[in-house]
């Protein structure tokens, strides 16, 4: 290329750079405007919430009024207040907010709010794919440890993978909750408990107690991964249909349990889930028995027994509550 052409090329680059600077200047101005609007919205929401709380407290005195019209008015206002809080939840999903304790400990005070629906859905979709791929890897790992590689070091690798998997799930779920996902209750706590359980399994030294429980735990892991794969496959299809009908939020997630929206076509999963829950109870009973063994010296045995019992109670009672609530609603619908 001749020097003259290089000079012409440089001249074009200079013009483009000037345009880029102007565009970037406008971008920074818009960003400042956006930050100002975000702060304004957050301020209005907090102020509105405080006033609604005060109003709800004032209305509480009229809860047992004998006047029918006043009673209906109070119920109507309380119902509207509940809807208003749901609207605030949706608004706050697009506004920067302080992270919860867990995210602060893991990530620090970093803004994790995604501003567009496209970005939120892409992150949710990536989370679901992560769960699917790791479920398959964990299934293969459990099968390999159970039937092929009978070494403590391979068990350690498998248990470390479980710890990393559940830790990562808790972080990603916390980010999704900050962005408007309505996953809550036991199905969030469940992963924290599973992280703890996997960590204790990782620290359990090799010995007689470990070898007695090893095959039972690996068989349980194989079954659990198979059920989780089934849940992902059928829940994702069900959620897609419900979102298309406008009956579910675009950030609703697949879970390792049973929720009310799954009654439409997913009740066949219940026997598999209940069998898995009772297997957790069986694990707890086995470990409680091992903890009383005369050769048991490891603290991990009793702690794991309590953790499996906690998982059983949480999973079983939560699933049972969903089933009971559904039957109660069906009874009310009958003439």
From Swiss-Prot:
Species: Xenopus tropicalis
Keyword set, alphabetical order: Coiled coil, Membrane, Nucleus, Transmembrane, Transmembrane helix
Pfam families in the record: TMEM120A-B (PF07851)
Listed GO CC annotations: nuclear inner membrane
Ranges in coiled-coil conformation: 1-39
Segments passing through the bilayer: 100-122, 130-150, 157-177, 193-213, 268-288, 300-320
Family in the record: Belongs to the TMEM120 family.
Subcellular localization, as worded in the UniProt entry: Nucleus inner membrane
InterPro entries (UniProt xref): TMEM120A/B
Main localization of the protein described in the UniProt heading: nucleus
Protein name: Transmembrane protein 120B
Membrane topology: Multi-pass membrane protein
Main function: Necessary for efficient adipogenesis. Does not show ion channel activity.
């Amino acid at each position: 290329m001749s020097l003259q052409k290089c000079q012409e090329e440089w001249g074009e680059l200079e013009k483009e750079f000037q345009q880029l600077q102007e565009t970037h200047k406008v971008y920074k101005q818009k960003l400042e405007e956006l930050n100002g609007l975000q702060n304004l919205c957050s301020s209005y929401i907090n102020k509105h919430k405080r006033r609604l709380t005060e109003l709800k407290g004032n209305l509480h005195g009229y809860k047992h009024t004998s006047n029918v019209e006043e009673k209906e008015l109070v119920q109507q206002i309380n119902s509207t207040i509940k809807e208003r809080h749901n609207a605030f939840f949706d608004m706050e999903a697009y506004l920067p907010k302080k992270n919860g304790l867990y995210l602060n400990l893991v990530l620090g005070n970093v803004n994790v709010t995604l501003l567009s629906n496209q970005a939120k859905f892409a992150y949710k979709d990536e989370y679901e794919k992560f769960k699917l791929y790791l479920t398959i890897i964990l299934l293969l790992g459990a099968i390999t440890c159970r039937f092929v590689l009978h070494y403590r070091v391979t068990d350690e690798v498998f248990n470390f993978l479980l710890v990393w998997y559940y830790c990562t799930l808790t972080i990603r779920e916390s980010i999704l909750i900050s962005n408007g996902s309505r996953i809550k209750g036991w199905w969030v706590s469940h992963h924290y408990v599973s992280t703890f359980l996997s960590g204790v399994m990782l620290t359990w030294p090799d010995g007689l107690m470990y070898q007695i429980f090893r095959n039972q735990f690996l068989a349980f892991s194989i079954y659990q991964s198979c059920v989780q794969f089934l849940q992902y496959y059928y829940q994702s299809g069900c959620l897609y249909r419900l979102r298309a009908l406008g009956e579910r939020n675009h950030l609703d997630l697949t879970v390792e349990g049973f929720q009310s929206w799954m009654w439409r076509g997913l009740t066949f999963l219940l026997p598999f889930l209940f069998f898995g829950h009772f297997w957790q109870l069986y694990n707890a009973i086995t470990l409680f028995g091992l903890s009383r063994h005369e050769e048991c010296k490891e603290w991990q045995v009793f702690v794991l027994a309590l953790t499996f019992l906690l998982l059983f109670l949480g999973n079983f009672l939560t699933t049972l509550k969903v089933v009971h609530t559904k039957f109660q609603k069906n009874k009310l619908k009958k003439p």
